[in-house]
């Protein structure tokens, strides 16, 4: 695995979420991967509390179904601006991110800034996320956190 592999993974990740292709988003994780969206305060203190915690493809599929079939919320668009990753070692990386949200009737607003803390795995399909903790810097999230960061 090299830096370009991680950049490509992150590009596909942001693109999938910005297109609301949650099946493509889920495919970027290993089958037993964990995904969290967690406030920096909790992360820094080693607290497990997270706004979103998904453990494995099963929980990810449940979240996708909930978003697509049952949740009622104002139509919105997101744009993920993902920085260059820092490879911590051969299987972990940190990558800064910015997510801008536009609700169709309002001006765009910053939804979250932060850092992805990733454990990576090389699979036959390429580099995949074995875990991603999206640690957001802001203590407050505008409205609600519906989609993954």
Predicted regions and their residues:
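A general boundary/transition motif marking the beginning of the first structured unit of a protein
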Residues: 1, 13, 48-52, 108
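Short, low-complexity N-terminal intrinsically disordered segments enriched in polar/charged residues
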Residues: 1-31
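A generic "alpha-helical surface" signal
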Residues: 4-7, 16, 51, 58, ...
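Short helix-to-loop capping/linker segments positioned immediately adjacent to catalytic or ligand/cofactor-binding
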Residues: 13-14, 70-76, 104-106
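Short, hydrophobic secondary-structure boundary micro-motifs
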Residues: 26, 36-37, 130
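A solvent-exposed, acidic/Ser-Thr-rich amphipathic alpha-helical stretch
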Residues: 31-92, 96
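A beta-strand edge to alpha-helix "cap/lid" segment located at domain peripheries
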Residues: 77-81, 86-149
